[in-house]
Amino acid sequence: MLSTINLTVGYRNGKRVTTVLENINVSLQAGELVCLLGANGIGKSTLLRTISGVQLALSGVVEINGRDLSAYSSKELSKLIGIVYTDRTLAGALTVEELVSLGRQPYTGFFGRLDDEDYKVVKEAVEAVGMSHKLHDYVATLSDGERQKAMIARALAQETPIIILDEPTAFLDVASRIETMQLLRQLAQSQQKAILLSTHDVGLSLPLTDRLWLVTSDSSVIEGTIEQLIADGTLNNLFSNRNVAFDSTVMDFRVKG
């Protein structure tokens, strides 16, 4: 569904080019949950912005369904990729229904008027994340976990085959982090969504993810199943320059001792 070919991401400022990650060859398929792991500030958000079309690649190709990302119009992309942001300041003055309805913008035309089918999709999206009882509540009154579910419902209402989330469990308490990850896993399977998320919740994400994209210290990205990345030592070497190592017995990183 989504793949990259020798992708290099970073920034241009006039003639100055800053490379963040390079030669990336990874894929994302329908029905799977993939977690993007790596150290803070290593380029995970830059990669997500690039493969979602928000930021231009420095070189290489991002393809969706075998077609170059640059060949799609912005409207076409809005029907292919839904993006869930972590910013807690967004949409506080809207009700849950109004927020989720924004996901229908690619289909509602210039004036944004929803018809019966649009309202049906919105209702189904809210139900899918277990928020029907909060439909008319203002987003500002929701807990962080409820707000994240509402944002996921907005992406579902957009009816895209791909959903990308940048740190969806940031700011959440333990129970909400677990609920959010379990929800994303269930949506990937039941609705055959291709879901990609970045996260620091290693211990929580590993049991639920289908595959990993690991950003290494040498600015490359390695993909594979947990079993593959444990067997070849990639997970253990992820933070090789730090005093931590991967412990496969607890599926998390521990301080070396």
Q: What feature does the model see in each segment?
A:
Residues I163-D166:
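Catalytic Walker B motif of ABC-type/P-loop ATPase nucleotide-binding domains
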Residues G60-D68, L77:
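Conserved ABC transporter NBD signature motif
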Residues S101, D116-K134:
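Conserved ABC ATPase "signature" region
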Residues F239-G257:
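ABC ATPase nucleotide-binding domains
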Residues S52:
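Helix-to-loop junction immediately C-terminal to a conserved catalytic motif
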